[in-house]
Amino acid sequence: MNKTLLDILVCPVTKASLTLSKDGTELISKVGGMAYPVRDGIPVLLETEARTLTADERLDSGSAK
C-alpha cells in the first residue's frame, strides 16, 4: 500500500492512525482494536466489515496476523 495513502487514512470509528498488517491484507487500528480488510489493494474502512483484534494481536507491537 502507498505510504502517502496510509499516512492519510484513519480509523473511521476512533480517527486514530492505521497500520498495515505484516501480510498486507488488513489495516489495523490499535486504539480501536479493529482490523479493516484490504481487498484487491483497496482498504474497506467500514465498521461492519472490520473484525475485532484478539488479545494477542492487541499486545503485538507489530500488526495483526
Swiss-Prot record:
InterPro entries: Trm112-like (IPR005651). It holds the Pfam family Trm112p. It comes from the Bacteria. One of its GO terms (cellular component) is cytosol. Belongs to the UPF0434 family. This is UPF0434 protein Mmwyl1_2153. It comes from Marinomonas sp. (strain MWYL1).
